[in-house]
Amino acid sequence: MNKIICNPLNLEYRYQIKKSGKEAVFREAADPTMLLFKGRYLMFVSMSGGFWHSDDLYSWEFHETPELPIYDYAPDVREVNGKVVFSASKRDEPCSFFVSGDPLNEPFTAVSVTFPFWDPATFQDDDGRVYFYWGCTNTEPIWGIEIDPATMQPIGEKVGLFGGNEDKYGWERKGENNKGAPPRSDAEIEMMVTHFMASIPPGAEAPSKEEMAKTIRHHLDNNRPYIEGAYMTKHNGKYYLQYAGPGTECNVYSDGVYVGDAPLGPFTYQEHNPFSSKPGGFIPAAGHGSTFQDKAGNWWHVSTMGISVNENFERRIGLFPCDFDGDGTMYCNQNFADYPFRLPDGKRGDMDTTQPAMILLSYNAKPEASSAQDGYASDKAADENVRTWWAAETNGKGEWLKLDLGEVFEVNAVQLNFADHKIPMPENWEKDAKKSMMEQRLILVKPQRTRFLLEGSEDGTNWHILKDCRNADTDFSHDFICFDGSTKLRFIKVSHIELPFNAVPAVSGLRVFGKGAGTAPAAVTEVDAPRTEERMNILLKWKPSANADGYNVRYGIAEDKLYSSWQVYGKSELDLSMIGKASGYYIAVDSFNRNGVTEGKVIFVS
């Protein structure tokens, strides 16, 4: 059986209700740690109230863990001496370690209380010694220390391993497309302080306004990258210490890696960096994750993808092929990384492919809808941008959305992406919320309910059902429907939409996949690629290819290492900002449309 999946992963992402200056109801799953334990994949993610588990990386089930601190960010799980060790983040008080010999059947129990940390990562070396890494600031390095495997208590002193270096590594620069925001004005600082002070729950110990202003200026006003999300992988005797930056709300949120000969370094920056990045396409970002091997020995990287519209921490999970080349370079294949791809049956044979398993057919398809709110027109469901969406005027069952692909295609799959559109705060939610000085938050561990009817047609008159969820009790906000073979379709329609909290129907992507029978676009051969004076950007501009829907810009430090990519739609230029100052780059601009992908000519920029 072909097992085909599509990012973001098709999970029942949990909602939370949050008040921290602003109020928001949104879904969040982030900072994933994946562990293959006793033949089963365990995936722990932030703000979910438990973990997902799977036998095959294809079908996932959820297991609640009320015994764990579910409101603590960045849960880490690793196997230590045959048991699963769990830790998560607390910045201002000592953190606990928890252990279970069988997380599906045996609750976790606390084994020790250690010290405050954020974004933890545990690693047991081949000799049985255990090391611990942590850090999540724009002012301090990633830290490492040896710990006792029995008590999890520190052995010796912590070591600063590395920090941010945005003056050398362009991808670490904060901001959308690595363009940092200008410094905040005194008025903006005062407004942030006022909002924060007003959000402190009654009775909570509060800092003075002067202390709060100082903290905000120190952490938020310097535009330095957040260096965070450590994770250690050992391969062929080398230690690969991974980290995330520059900020989870940015499309350029990525994972980089330093390499060393010992668990606590010294570490050297890998020239190919970031090794996991996805700044373009439908849903951006591929940072703060973990690296693991599947049952066949294939390497994978699972990480955080971003929406960040309703709230900065509105995030999802992505899974990407990963490997180490003959030189020991760690890299991912993230070409068309939000298109469907096949899970390998045994050893992977297509690690370096530039061709997706299926092609997108719905980009800029002609839309029609029952109604639409101002600024949320139906074309937003086909613009390949998860941050924009169609929203109906009412939450009635009579609302619908339809796409016309323009001609009949052999369709293999549909990904139906729902958005959370201006959900009002539920009444009396605060009574069950977890309260702190910074915020009030309530995780809804039980899934909500998402219902719809998906239909297809060749002529727009005679319709047949593709998926009927009108009576479902599931909650898949990024539902991926892969057909057994293909079906001929020109029109796709979603109706009878019922979303959680009685929200109005909203769709960020009605994405249709297959492959056309026509001609792929011509190759891109003429590319201008001046490099900026500070050498941190390459300003790419190319001659458009006739009939292209978009371009996949591949780049890397050698002609046989075009490991990074940036997918763009509707334009023929790109400010390539995720490069290292000291490196030269090989670049190819591949063109694509409904009929396929054509590789571009490789150029070199010194």
Where do the language-model regions lie?
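Extracellular low-complexity, O-glycosylation-prone stalks/linkers
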Residues: 455, 547-570
